[in-house]
Amino acid sequence: MKHSKKLLLCISFLLITFFIGGCGFMNKDDGKETEIKQNFNKMLNVYPTKNLENFYDKEGYRDEEFDKDDKGTWIVHSKMVIEPKGKNMESRGMVLFINRNTRTSKGYFIVNEIEKDRKGRPINNKKKYPVKMKNNKIIPTKPISNDKLKKEIENFKFFVQYGNFKDIKNYKDGDISYNPNVPSYSAKYQLSNNEYNVQQLRKRYDIPTKKVPKLLLKGDGDLKGSSVGSKNLEFTFIENKEENIYFTDSVLFSPSEDNES
């Protein structure tokens, strides 16, 4: 009888210990999830910035990677990738280096069609067209004979100029993940075709599918802040071996470099 009571007490103690320990792990996970969400909220605060010249006066996260007198450079990058079934993958996008020291902005409009050779290996056909930004307008810095392409470049808008995440708290099916070994972290949300950002993308790009996209926020580096890590977002419409349709965007603050543009 005494042995039965001791055994019962022992089992009860183990169950209580396990329960408390489990609660501890749960609190840690909840805390990390909150930290990740707060980190992405800081990233999304720049959306929208309609006038790109506002970045000249916008401060970013600084650490020991920055020289004392370096005000830093904002790097904005937007790209649409479309690979219809049975066709080549094509990407069209732009990257702009907004230098706060010189208050000048230079970059490239980049078109890349990826073909495959006889062995199925990818072949890049990348073309870069140099541009500058002045008075919030994109201007090609070299002659472009193709009028349609020239107009596409001049009318280009970065996602940060029109994207808006004020309703992110209402996004459904939030899936938060964290890998401490890299470290890397992400948040995935299922969107609807009625969502503002999705409507804006469909308005600006000829997206050959009516499928509802998912929003993936990705980051790596120290969650508390680092100029070495990166953050970007992706709207994934279709992703498989035969067909890919997605849009990527990033706004990064980095130490300035002489050869960056």
From Swiss-Prot:
GO cellular component terms given for this protein: plasma membrane
Record membrane topology: Lipid-anchor
Cleaved signal peptide residues: 1-22
Disulfide-bond pairs as recorded: none
This protein's UniProt keywords: Cell membrane, Lipoprotein, Membrane, Palmitate, Signal
Gene3D superfamilies the UniProt entry points to: 2.50.20.40
InterPro entries: Csa, Csa_sf
Broad class of where this protein is predominantly found: membrane
Subcellular location: Cell membrane
Lipid anchor positions (N-palmitoyl cysteine): C23
Lipid-substituted positions (S-diacylglycerol cysteine): C23
Family, similarity comment: Belongs to the staphylococcal tandem lipoprotein family.
This protein's name: Uncharacterized lipoprotein SERP2445
Record organism: Staphylococcus epidermidis (strain ATCC 35984 / DSM 28319 / BCRC 17069 / CCUG 31568 / BM 3577 / RP62A)
Phylogenetic lineage: Bacteria, Bacillati, Bacillota, Bacilli, Bacillales
